[in-house]
Structures are given as structure tokens and as C-alpha cells.
């Protein structure tokens, strides 16, 4: 799974075609509590549950931090 693939799926998950590496909970309208759940669920599905085991994934507040966390945990390249 690549960074680009993750971004494409997350754009669909929270219905925001402008979602990018600079997106945060503060500047992304659809990234509310339901959006957070959609992101977590999408990541779990895409990673076959591997993201469920990562501490802190549910607390992520920015796409750049999320991507970094996924890289550190060898979920994406």
C-alpha cells in the first residue's frame, strides 16, 4: 500500500476530494468524530487489521502525522 493509495481511500472515507498531507482536524470540515471513525475503519480494512494494533492511531489529528505513523509501523512504503 502506498501513500497515494491511502490518500485516495481517505478522501472517499470522509467525502473530501481536497484531503492532502496538510489536512488536519482543524482545517478539514468533514474530519469530525464521524470522520475520525471513517478514517480508522478505512485504515483497518485496507491494512487487514494491522492498524488496529498501532497505539495512538485513533488520536491522530493530521494526515501528515498519520502517514508518518503508518510508515514507522511498516504499513505503507
Task: Locate predicted features.
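Phosphopantetheine-dependent thiolation modules in NRPS/PKS and related acyl-activating systems
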Residues: 1-77
